[in-house]
Amino acid sequence: MALKLVLMLMVALLAAVWSPPAVTASVTYDHKSVIINGQRRILISGSIHYPRSTPEMWPDLIQKAKDGGLDVIQTYVFWNGHEPSPGQYYFGGRYDLVRFLKLVKQAGLYAHLRIGPYVCAEWNFGGFPVWLKYVPGIHFRTDNGPFKAAMGKFTEKIVSMMKAEGLYETQGGPIILSQIENEYGPVEYYDGAAGKSYTNWAAKMAVGLNTGVPWVMCKQDDAPDPVINTCNGFYCDYFSPNKDNKPKMWTEAWTGWFTGFGGAVPQRPAEDMAFAVARFIQKGGSFINYYMYHGGTNFGRTAGGPFISTSYDYDAPIDEYGLLRQPKWGHLRDLHKAIKLCEPALVSGEPTITSLGQNQESYVYRSKSSCAAFLANFNSRYYATVTFNGMHYNLPPWSVSILPDCKTTVFNTARVGAQTTTMKMQYLGGFSWKAYTEDTDALNDNTFTKDGLVEQLSTTWDRSDYLWYTTYVDIAKNEEFLKTGKYPYLTVMSAGHAVHVFINGQLSGTAYGSLDNPKLTYSGSAKLWAGSNKISILSVSVGLPNVGNHFETWNTGVLGPVTLTGLNEGKRDLSLQKWTYQIGLHGETLSLHSLTGSSNVEWGEASQKQPLTWYKTFFNAPPGNEPLALDMNTMGKGQIWINGQSIGRYWPAYKASGSCGSCDYRGTYNEKKCLSNCGEASQRWYHVPRSWLIPTGNFLVVLEEWGGDPTGISMVKRSVASVCAEVEELQPTMDNWRTKAYGRPKVHLSCDPGQKMSKIKFASFGTPQGTCGSFSEGSCHAHKSYDAFEQEGLMQNCVGQEFCSVNVAPEVFGGDPCPGTMKKLAVEAICE
């Protein structure tokens, strides 16, 4: 018995020794920063929305974010993806939130979970499930019982799931922050006392879920304690939290802007993005999140707006396809390295601020063992030479220099050391098509007839983009237009977003709205004959609105009036007569986008310019690992499916309006400043995830609404075309600071894996002009500029290599071509 007791005691002691320690992690905050496990942190975050990429892409995206210097991955939670019908939840495929967060943890990063559950995000209906609109008595985002009950239930569902999976930092998981609501401040102002009451309820509800991590509210100046109010915008250096005990946080630093069908493509210069972030950190900010770090794709019908494009690239540091956008990714990576060198000083105390000139200033942070300085020139036109600590510093316009030891410049936001990459969409081949055209005279079994016009969303519940409105018009034989040939005019007024009008089975015309004005009026000649005439209006939605007040009041579809003018009687109002309605297209009912459903009809030879036509083909997966896309430039408007999965809507016929010109990083940025694609398709290429493909026999279906040319559709692959660098001979470098040594900066060039530099298109050490793709020699040029990259036997030879480095120094290029002049090296290499 004694022996047994001894053995039991030994087992107990061993268990105590070898049992894993209890989780003691904590996340709090003070006026300086978020505090993780007792340590103040400067946190760099980036938004990657899990449904906008495939699970197969997630590990690489997260790793590239980590390599870019990020500490945190931020994502919204998409209610309509997770609860498509009341009480029916889905967390699989692209909506596998738990898998995504575990990959974040596996990579050694934190997570910021923005539950919302309103997300905006240019996402269909702002993330709300459409069924929520039809809950009796509901009013969205206000002090309303039915809405609060549904919102609270979903929020608790997500929090409970996160707890069950051990995903909060206090459980050993990655989540260090959560968000409730989203940009509610402007709505609260509109809603008055009910809005204020709702804000307080939402905050109290969230905090009461006891996640163990702080909650934030963005664009919510009156966020109740202990919730932290945060900033969203292109710039947030001006922002201050509403209490002295809260840190200065930037939840959405917009890296670019979204693209709308019919709009140009916005781009934000890397220099300005870096300037905005450096200014925010300089002025006491401690958490910054790039919205977006990877934008991805609005697969299926998830794009909101309306009129938001299928691409959600956002000019993010990682592009829609998962490739690095250079120099933005590399320049921000270098910025993050510089900021991290300053972290001990930044979190220790308040800055000493000194004016260095009319538009120049210094912010100095000190700790017991460190000193960090930020020197800013916020003049948007002129360089400035400033004196700081007895030394002279040259500051380009609209820039910040970072000195992690208060002496040595390691980074300037306007001096880009990272390479610039130009991309190409390489043609891989076309397709052989079969076609099936919708019979506009045929109606499905799911039709109904009603006096007057119906609202589209309440009829379709967004199960389809399409709703047919069909009526009949009797024309007497004595109508004057039958003699003169001057046909009457049909006018259709719609709440949006597009209509295709068919008269007696023939397409008569099309009209559509825009991102800024989704409502539309169709007016066109109606070729009617004596007797009964069939008028069919196909109303098309292009994503549901994602921002605004009182979602429950929003309408789509043909609300009227619908009139005919030019008859003997003058005007005839058709709005109140009998209409027959059909939800969706016949091909949707038959599931023609699926391999099984496609066998339900007879397919014929493909023809061009045929409206409401389904096209199908089979193809083999292209070899290689490069991202793939479909070039849809010869088509009009419609949708695409591969192996039954929807790539999204396409609309290359909607050309981009706007003013596109040169882009200067200097000066305040907005979404209208740096535009491209004017006069061209807003979106030409549509991402085809490789993980959706099988080696052979992939099934591709295209639904064309207007009538395009399918013979012009092709598969392309996205890869690097050329790489460029432009580095000044005295450009600051991180390596020199670390080694406390003086050395020359280097140019680093790198093609994609599997590529090599085939030739040097341009090289000049001196005063070269232009930008990547259009460099030219300046008045000063070293005639041996090319030798450093091409001459055999040199250590830094680049031709034939995947990557290479070259010192930016006169001796490398045969001597100083212009003594006394500040020089730089510009180079462009072709990647094959």
UniProtKB/Swiss-Prot annotation:
<dbReference type="GO" id="GO:0048046">
    <property type="term" value="C:apoplast"/>
</dbReference>
<dbReference type="Pfam" id="PF01301">
    <property type="entry name" value="Glyco_hydro_35"/>
</dbReference>
<dbReference type="InterPro" id="IPR019801">
    <property type="entry name" value="Glyco_hydro_35_CS"/>
</dbReference>
<dbReference type="InterPro" id="IPR008979">
    <property type="entry name" value="Galactose-bd-like_sf"/>
</dbReference>
<dbReference type="Pfam" id="PF21467">
    <property type="entry name" value="BetaGal_gal-bd"/>
</dbReference>
<dbReference type="Pfam" id="PF17834">
    <property type="entry name" value="GHD"/>
</dbReference>
<dbReference type="GO" id="GO:0030246">
    <property type="term" value="F:carbohydrate binding"/>
</dbReference>
<dbReference type="InterPro" id="IPR048913">
    <property type="entry name" value="BetaGal_gal-bd"/>
</dbReference>
<protein>
    <recommendedName>
        <fullName>Beta-galactosidase</fullName>
        <ecNumber>3.2.1.23</ecNumber>
    </recommendedName>
</protein>
<dbReference type="InterPro" id="IPR001944">
    <property type="entry name" value="Glycoside_Hdrlase_35"/>
</dbReference>
<feature type="active site" description="Proton donor">
    <location>
        <position position="183"/>
    </location>
</feature>
<dbReference type="Pfam" id="PF02140">
    <property type="entry name" value="SUEL_Lectin"/>
</dbReference>
<dbReference type="InterPro" id="IPR000922">
    <property type="entry name" value="Lectin_gal-bd_dom"/>
</dbReference>
<keyword id="KW-0732">Signal</keyword>
<feature type="active site" description="Nucleophile">
    <location>
        <position position="252"/>
    </location>
</feature>
<keyword id="KW-0378">Hydrolase</keyword>
<feature type="domain" description="SUEL-type lectin">
    <location>
        <begin position="741"/>
        <end position="832"/>
    </location>
</feature>
<comment type="similarity">
    <text>Belongs to the glycosyl hydrolase 35 family.</text>
</comment>
<dbReference type="InterPro" id="IPR017853">
    <property type="entry name" value="Glycoside_hydrolase_SF"/>
</dbReference>
<dbReference type="GO" id="GO:0005975">
    <property type="term" value="P:carbohydrate metabolic process"/>
</dbReference>
<dbReference type="InterPro" id="IPR041392">
    <property type="entry name" value="GHD"/>
</dbReference>
<keyword id="KW-0052">Apoplast</keyword>
<dbReference type="GO" id="GO:0004565">
    <property type="term" value="F:beta-galactosidase activity"/>
</dbReference>
<keyword id="KW-0964">Secreted</keyword>
<dbReference type="InterPro" id="IPR043159">
    <property type="entry name" value="Lectin_gal-bd_sf"/>
</dbReference>
<feature type="signal peptide">
    <location>
        <begin position="1"/>
        <end position="25"/>
    </location>
</feature>
<keyword id="KW-0326">Glycosidase</keyword>
<dbReference type="InterPro" id="IPR031330">
    <property type="entry name" value="Gly_Hdrlase_35_cat"/>
</dbReference>
